[in-house]
């Protein structure tokens, strides 16, 4: 398969790319590679020149990149930052999916939501502060956008979504310990635990699935 991976240089994008490129033709899109997906003209032009069997959308604006900063309450959140999360995580995602669909007669789209797109982020994980609410709201929107696209692009293009829980990387040990204690599986997810699921959703093995959101969170959302 030829697979386009957006956000290919991020935590999950890089892991998924390295796994899939063992058996598939991978095309990488990422801001670090000079691809600005918030630029509508660029997105239109790029997808008109590049077709594929599957689009895997790993890109997202996530406030973990600001983990060193003190987290405030909802009264400290600027509307500018709120709008930016929605613009990148929803508006840009819609643009990318639309241009893939415009230029491919059939295929698959795999989007990424998050467990915080299903339930609210817990303040006790952030010392009483808040993970940015617009991140969670945007990830909830990804689930609905996936259903919308699946409805309107079927049967030619299937669209599904993965909602992962917290992925272990370089968080401080206190965060990992608290997160793990709040999850039935008592640990965070390893970054390679989504690889085969993504490949499954890209393949004909999932040929009767569309509009689905698969939760992979160690049971986080069942409590």
Locate predicted features.
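Short, small/polar-rich loop/turn modules that mediate ligand/substrate recognition or access, typified
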Residues: 154-158, 209-211
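N-terminal Rossmann NAD(P)H-binding glycine-rich loop of SDR-like oxidoreductase domains
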Residues: 6-18
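Catalytic Tyr-X3-Lys loop
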Residues: 75-95, 110, 135-137, 142, ...
């Amino acid at each position: 398969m030829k697979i386009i991976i957006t956000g290919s240089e991020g935590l999950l994008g890089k892991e998924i790319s390295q796994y899939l490129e063992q058996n598939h033709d991978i095309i990488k899109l990422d801001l670090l590679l000079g691809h600005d997906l918030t630029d509508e003209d660029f997105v239109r032009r790029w997808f008109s020149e590049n077709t594929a069997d599957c689009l895997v959308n790993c890109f997202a604006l996530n406030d973990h990149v600001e983990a060193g900063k003190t987290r405030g309450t909802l009264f400290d959140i600027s509307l500018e930052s709120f709008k930016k999360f929605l613009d990148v995580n929803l508006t840009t995602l819609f643009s990318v999916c639309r241009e893939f669909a415009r230029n491919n007669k059939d295929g698959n789209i795999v989007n990424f939501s998050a467990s915080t797109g299903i339930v609210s982020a817990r303040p006790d994980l952030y010392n009483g502060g808040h993970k940015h609410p617009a991140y969670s709201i945007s990830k909830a929107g990804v689930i609905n956008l996936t259903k919308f696209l699946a409805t309107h692009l079927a049967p030619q293009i299937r669209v599904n979504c993965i909602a992962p829980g917290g992925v272990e990387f370089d968080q401080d040990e206190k965060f990992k310990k608290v997160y793990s204690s709040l999850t039935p599986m008592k640990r965070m997810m390893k970054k390679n635990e989504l690889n085969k699921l993504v490949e499954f959703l890209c393949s004909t093995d999932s040929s009767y699935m569309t509009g689905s959101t698969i939760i992979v969170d160690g049971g986080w959302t069942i409590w």
